[in-house]
Amino acid sequence: VTLAAPIQLAATVNEHLAQISNTLIYSAMAVYTLAFFAYIAEWLFGSRSKVARTAAALTAPKTQETAAAAQGPAVTVKSAGGTAVLERPKVVVRSAAGSRDVPDGPGAHGGDQQGDLYGRIAISLTTLAFVVEAAGVVARAASVERAPWGNMYEFNITFSTVAVGVYLALLALKKNVRWLGLFLTATVLLDLGLAVTVLYTASDQLVPALHSYWLYIHVSTAILCGAVFYVGAVGTLLYLFKDSYENKLATGGTPGRFASSVLERLPASATLDKFCYRVNAAVFPLWTFTIIAGAIWAESAWGRYWGWDPKETWAFITWVAYACYLHARSTAGWKGRKAAYIALIAFACWLFNYYGVNIFVGGKHSYAGV
């Protein structure tokens, strides 16, 4: 049997398993909602103390503080009646790319113990929601005895499961990504809400063109790439906000209280930038393989490797955009915000290739099911 051979599908749909899958997906959404509010509580309690509000300055290396003290700050002389007042200027320390990361999670920045407790509860709830959602995906697959990504609804629920799995895997590897939890659960809830309200399709068998083992190879890698690109895009957005916040502080500006309480909880902008680059660079070769696998499948299904079908075209545009980002990130004058904008454009191309092409553009890849 070759990889291009058709796969054997179940003749009927197990409606009982399909209903169990729906129940599990809704249950996962409920647990994600609880996790989201737990993350909010962590950020609120973790940012209320004076120590927490000045946490950004505390993340700078002590060597910088020692050097600044040795040099001695400049002073401003003010006249207060007949007395000369020496005023120490405000010093804003900005973490450099080589400085250490901030402690993991908002509660680690000096917030109270209750904030840390909420953070641990949030992680536990996220893990529980991930397990429940994964069970829902498996039940969906079992109901039709095939891979659970034959339409947009199935792709969405599998995509969000993998995205949360990537986040939890990074936590398990002791990576400093706990700050992603709040934003991840919020967007996963949006993704699942869209899936169950707009994209929902009842369990059914695949269209004939998808009866191939390449379905397991090509689409699974596309889902994994999208999930990792998504994590990188969330980090890139946070990097842009954090960089603006640091720039405002460096120029003597005073950010709003809400911005300060939220953005100072994040790692330094240089750390966020490095994280996003590593994430996107790590998955880019797999995206290259995804496109190649799709071309091989296209030759088997339609007798040609490439035909500039809208889905193929936008997959290639996405590849070019991420290649430009990786090149810009290593080019002097294009690092930082300029490269970040390219990364967001690249992810926007990926999103359009999925939502825009599937829903609004016709072609040989019209398997949305909506």
Predicted regions and their residues:
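Polytopic transmembrane helical bundles with strong interfacial aromatic enrichment
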Residues: 1-303, 307-370
